[in-house]
């Protein structure tokens, strides 16, 4: 089994990538830019996949993070793509991802204080 530390690093990297992809965009620009939307959606899927790979025990130990909602969002994106509401994706990227990144970073440092790089 892949170490949970690596999934946390994946989530942080994907969150950072979301911020990079939306930099310089406002809501209307994002909604009109299919390339940026696809990139952000991919990173949100990576975040959800990483969250789904964490053990239940790990997720229970960190209840402040809405793990189930993150995984459910990933599942919706993957299985119900044509029902996506792009303004919700924008709000997720701009409002929720930065908070999640801070939460996951704090968990990483608390759980694995000597190891914050993938190697």
Predicted regions: what is each one?
Residues 1-119:
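Solvent-exposed interaction patches of small proteins and small membrane subunits
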């Amino acid at each position: 089994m892949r170490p949970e530390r690596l999934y946390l690093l994946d989530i942080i990297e994907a969150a950072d990538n979301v911020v990079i992809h939306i930099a310089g965009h406002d809501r209307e620009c994002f909604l009109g830019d299919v390339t940026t939307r696809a990139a952000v959606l991919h990173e949100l899927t990576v975040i959800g996949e990483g969250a789904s790979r964490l053990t239940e025990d790990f997720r229970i130990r960190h209840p402040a993070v809405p793990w189930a909602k993150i995984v459910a969002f990933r599942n919706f994106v993957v299985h119900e793509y044509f029902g996506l509401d792009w303004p919700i994706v924008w709000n997720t990227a701009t409002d929720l991802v930065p908070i999640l990144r801070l939460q996951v970073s704090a968990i990483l440092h608390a759980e694995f204080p000597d190891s914050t790089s993938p190697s």
